[in-house]
Design a protein with these regions (language model features):
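Donor-binding and catalytic core of enzymes assembling or modifying cell-surface/extracellular glycoconjugates
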Residues: 4-87
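Nucleotide-sugar donor-binding patch of glycosyltransferase catalytic domains
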Residues: 34-42, 47, 76-135
């Protein structure tokens, strides 16, 4: 189960200077623009083959301050690269501090006993992104 993109975008901070880069391959920029207007610009790196160029994807992820991802290759690669990562899914493992003990830079938005809700995950993700931005200033 994945949160809906429109739910995630609704809770993302709207501050100037924030760039959202899509790490999802096959994204249709024109469709996204029509569906979401100019409220938030979701950028794609058109020259990057996100299916066959894993080194390029790793380089892109390494250049980001924060990654938000469902449980996909992007999530696991981001965590392995040491990039601060918000998981919109349940943790694979969980420590008593709430994080993933294998990847201390990965923050799951759901506890193992919670029922998945796209809006709940999106709201928590937005708050976590906002906290990250505040701490980075």
């Amino acid at each position: 189960m994945y949160p809906k993109l429109e739910d995630l975008l609704a809770f993302m901070p709207k501050e100037k200077g924030i760039r959202l880069v899509s790490l999802q391959y096959g994204v249709d920029d024109e469709r996204l623009a029509k569906e979401h207007g100019n409220s938030i610009k979701l950028e794609t790196i058109k020259d990057l083959d996100q299916v066959n160029d894993l080194e390029g994807v790793a380089a892109l992820i390494s250049s980001l301050d924060l990654v938000v991802s469902a449980s996909t290759t992007v999530l696991h690669l981001s965590c392995a690269l040491g990039v601060t990562t918000i998981s919109t899914y349940y943790p694979n493992f969980r420590s008593s501090r709430g994080g993933d003990p294998l990847f201390m830079n990965c923050y799951p938005m759901l506890a193992g006993n919670e029922i998945f809700s796209s809006e709940k995950v999106a709201e928590r993700t937005g708050k976590t992104v906002q906290n990250f931005i505040r701490e980075e200033k």
